[in-house]
Structures are given as C-alpha cells and as structure tokens.
Amino acid sequence: MPTPKKGPRLGGSASQQKHLLSNMAASLIEHGAIKTTDAKAKVLRPYIEKIITKAKAGTVADRRAVLKLIPHKDVVAYLFDELAPKFENREGGYTRIIKLENRSGDNAPMSQISLVLEETVTSEANRATRAAASKQAEEAKAEEAEATEAEAEETTEEK
C-alpha cells in the first residue's frame, strides 16, 4: 500500500495512521463489527476491502502481503481460512457503515462498520422476479402485436 498522501491524517503522522488502520482492520476481522468515528470508518472501508479481496485469492503471496498490512498471524489465518470463503460470491461491498448517535463526550459523529456476512439471497430473488416479469412483458407485447396484425389483415380484406 502506498504511503498516505497530503491532507488530514487520522491521529498524526503517516506511520501512526498505518498502525491505526492496521489495528482497526484486525479488530474488524476479529469481531465482525467495530464502533468508531465517521472519519475513521470512511478511511478504513477501502483499506479492509482491498485486504479481503486479496484474501479471496488465497495465494501465499497474498497472505504475505496481508501480513505486512496486518501483523497478527491469528487474525490473518482466520481471514484467509474462514472469512474469505464466505465472500467468495461477492464482488466487493464486504463492509457496511451504519451511522450512530454522536459521542456524548465530544459530540463526535459515530458509526459502526461491520462485515456483511449475509448471503445476497434477496438480490438474487429480486433478479429472478425481474427476469420473470420481463419475460411476461415480452410475451404480452408479442400477443398485442399479433392481435394488431390480425386486425390489420381483417380491415384490408374488408376493403
């Protein structure tokens, strides 16, 4: 991963930001969901998405690359062995961010970032119903076209 560019940092220098993201990613993988500020959640999302995509490939080189980013062997082993197969049919969108109430101490906007482990059954069911509806619409259009052609033939025969 490239070093962070110019702009605001989460908690100080680039090295501190790397460590912060590494620890947050490890906690997210270990617990499935973490509660953090909006800014940290928005920065963590692309970071963890890239890591999960590498874990889905599952090669030794990918495992070593992830170990450089998250130096927790047990967490990386859990990611590659148990979590990655759950995301096999998913092309991205492994996390979701849910807005929470502001923190009471400093009124900071809070969010919960969590892994999306549910199957996308609803979207597949929606696709199936849309496909069936489009087939029915095509059949209805074909029937209407046949009816109009039959009417046109009748009117030409009458003349």
Curated annotation (Swiss-Prot):
The keyword S-adenosyl-L-methionine does not apply. It comes from the Bacteria. Residues 124-135 have a biased composition (Low complexity). One of its GO terms (cellular component) is cytosolic large ribosomal subunit. Residues 124-159 are annotated as: Disordered. Part of the 50S ribosomal subunit. Contacts protein L32. Keywords: Ribonucleoprotein, Ribosomal protein. One of its GO terms (biological process) is translation. Belongs to the bacterial ribosomal protein bL17 family. This is Large ribosomal subunit protein bL17. It holds the Pfam family Ribosomal_L17. Coiled coil: none annotated. Transmembrane segments: none annotated. Residues 145-159 have a biased composition (Acidic residues). Signal peptide: none annotated. PROSITE patterns: RIBOSOMAL_L17. GO terms for molecular function: structural constituent of ribosome.
